[in-house]
């Protein structure tokens, strides 16, 4: 997704009445389409998904596709919004993108480090 298309996507999110806001944080040349990070703010919870798929994943784990989720509940999402200066879900996603997208496929790890440093609790699971 080009920066221009991505910016339009974020602008549409600001005016969306749906409680679900999502965006691709990082996907460009140099990082394969098999590795991407998506942030979702939905139902007052914040979630970061790091998806990895491909032959090496199948060899190591017996599955082509692994999804690693980091999830913050409502209270910790509010704390994350406070720590990032965001006022709503769309603002939170924009702030997360601004701060962490440049880390590429390491963005999930960087967000986790930020949360730990700020005392924000999250849960993790993998499918």
Enumerate the predicted regions with their spans:
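Intrinsically disordered, low-complexity boundary segments flanking structured domains
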Residues: 11-12, 35, 57-59
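Residue-level marker of intrinsically disordered, low-complexity segments enriched
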Residues: 22-23, 50, 55, 109, ...
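Acidic, aromatic-enriched beta-alpha/helix-loop junctions
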Residues: 46-91
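Low-complexity intrinsically disordered segments
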Residues: 73-127
């Amino acid at each position: 997704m080009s920066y221009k298309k991505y910016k339009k996507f974020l602008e549409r999110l600001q005016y969306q009445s749906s409680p679900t806001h999502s965006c691709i944080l990082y996907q460009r040349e140099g990082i394969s389409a098999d590795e991407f990070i998506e942030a979702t703010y939905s139902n007052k919870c914040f979630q970061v998904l790091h998806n990895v798929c491909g032959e090496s994943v199948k060899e190591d784990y017996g599955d082509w596709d692994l999804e690693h989720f980091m999830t913050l509940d409502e209270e910790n999402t509010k704390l994350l919004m406070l720590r990032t200066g965001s006022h709503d879900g769309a603002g939170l996603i924009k702030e997360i993108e601004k701060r962490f997208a440049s880390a590429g496929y390491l963005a999930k790890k960087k967000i986790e480090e930020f949360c730990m440093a700020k005392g924000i609790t999250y849960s993790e699971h993998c499918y």
